[in-house]
Amino acid sequence: MRLLFSALLALLSSIILLFVLLPVAATVTLQLFNFDEFLKAASDPAVWKVVLTTYYAALISTLIAVIFGTPLAYILARKSFPGKSVVEGIVDLPVVIPHTVAGIALLVVFGSSGLIGSFSPLKFVDALPGIVVAMLFVSVPIYINQAKEGFASVDVRLEHVARTLGSSPLRVFFTVSLPLSVRHIVAGAIMSWARGISEFGAVVVIAYYPMIAPTLIYERYLSEGLSAAMPVAAILILLSLAVFVALRIIVGREDVSEGQG
């Protein structure tokens, strides 16, 4: 019976892993049979400009999420207050809103006649700031929840000891809470960055231009077909995978160094 249960677990796990892996692997592998088109896309300056714009916008949105999301994550992990569940619901709201709806909502606020866009010196519609706010909107819940989990995993008694030794709350935060939560914070930042790169629905509503990679892939698919979209999609998959693995390795090495120290 135990062997049967283990086999069932392995089978079901393999099916879901295959479901995730097969489309990605097929997209990349098929470029071996269409290598000329892949090289053409890989040597196209317009493609690289779009890819760099995508990564740059996602990086900015991630930095904003870290700066403003970390304090909120700490509050949610450490404090109890009336309406806390409401705040947590607001944080998770972008997860359940369809992304085209999110784009419309952002347009209402950041559009040229919107609540913020009407008087802001920044232009959001069809501009880089619009891409950033769209990426930030859909990715910030990932970062906040991951950072909150990190802060919650820190033994509160360590903070109390630091306070009894005369450290201020701010010093305790930066010398105890933050360092002990850094693995979750880095993981949250990586996932937030990756989520920003993959965003399409919200971005295309508020800022079709300048193009990001998902928008370019969509446009080429509509105008030229699947064969034209696949090389760019494969490039984005390979680059994102390389960066993601590199960041994971860096984080893993830091964990090993801390363990040896």
From Swiss-Prot:
Q: Where is this region: Gate 2?
A: 193-203
According to the entry, every stretch annotated as the ABC transmembrane type-1 domain falls at: 51-247
Per the UniProt record, the source organism is: Archaeoglobus fulgidus (strain ATCC 49558 / DSM 4304 / JCM 9628 / NBRC 100126 / VC-16)
User: Which GO cellular component terms, listed alphabetically, does the Swiss-Prot or TrEMBL entry include?
Assistant: plasma membrane
Similarity field: Belongs to the binding-protein-dependent transport system permease family.
Indicate how the chain sits in the lipid bilayer.
Multi-pass membrane protein
Q: What is this protein called?
A: Molybdate/tungstate transport system permease protein WtpB
Q: What does this protein do?
A: Part of the ABC transporter complex WtpABC involved in molybdate/tungstate import. Probably responsible for the translocation of the substrate across the membrane.
The alphabetized UniProt keywords are: Cell membrane, Membrane, Molybdenum, Transmembrane, Transmembrane helix, Transport
Q: Which gene is transcribed and translated to give this protein?
A: wtpB
Q: For side Extracellular, which residue ranges?
A: 29-46, 111-123, 210-230
Compartment(s): Cell membrane
Subunit details: The complex is composed of two ATP-binding proteins (WtpC), two transmembrane proteins (WtpB) and a solute-binding protein (WtpA).
